[in-house]
A protein has these predicted regions:
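Conserved GNAT acetyl-CoA-binding A-motif
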Residues: 128-139
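Terminal substrate-recognition subdomain of acyl/acetyltransferases
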Residues: 165-177
Length: 177
């Protein structure tokens, strides 16, 4: 049976933190510094983050989803208000608008890659009519191909993340009417 996607509840925070940390370990070893990935408080910081998001965040500000398989959370996603770094979106001249979205999180265990869970999570947290931006690690060809398949295009904006030192490429998907 394929994973099912649902809205998470505060009791899911610890499991979502575990998915967040485990998928970073699966995906980013060799891309992110080991000291960050191996930090003893890494899981605690992610647990606190998800607890805050699921209990304190303005309900309309963030949309979260959890994919569940056999009673276990195997994937997570979250979108929210745009990060407006003052850079034009999509190679144009307009910056992202407040009604646009930013995809902050989309992670799933490797064991469920290819099941459609990534697509289901993406669809659960994004409105196709909203212009959406995201930052994706570079290199991360699997993720970049997935986003390209979903209409995201690299807009030429590149940065090095201050938190983890990873080179990231911004991808933008124009809203559809």
């Amino acid at each position: 049976m394929a994973p099912t996607v649902r809205r998470p509840v505060p009791a899911d925070a610890a499991a979502m933190a575990r998915v967040h940390v485990d998928t970073w370990l699966e995906t980013y070893r060799g891309i992110m510094p080991d000291k960050l990935l191996d930090a003893p408080d890494f899981i605690d910081r992610r647990r606190q983050m998800w607890t805050n998001i699921l209990t304190e965040a303005a309900p309309s500000a963030f949309i979260c989803a959890a994919a569940e398989h056999d009673g276990e959370i195997v994937g997570i996603a979250m979108s929210g208000p745009p990060q407006n770094d003052g850079e034009p979106a999509g190679g144009g001249t307009e910056a992202l608008r407040p009604e646009d979205r930013h995809l902050y999180v989309l992670y799933a265990y490797r064991s469920v890659h290819g099941t459609g869970v990534g697509q289901d999570l993406l669809d659960a947290v994004l409105d196709p009519s909203a212009t959406t931006a995201l930052w994706v690690a570079d290199p991360n060809p699997r993720a970049q191909a997935f986003y390209a398949k979903n209409g995201f295009v690299a807009d030429g904006t590149v940065k090095t993340d201050e938190y983890d030192g990873v080179r990231e490429v911004r991808m933008v998907r124009p809203g559809r009417a």
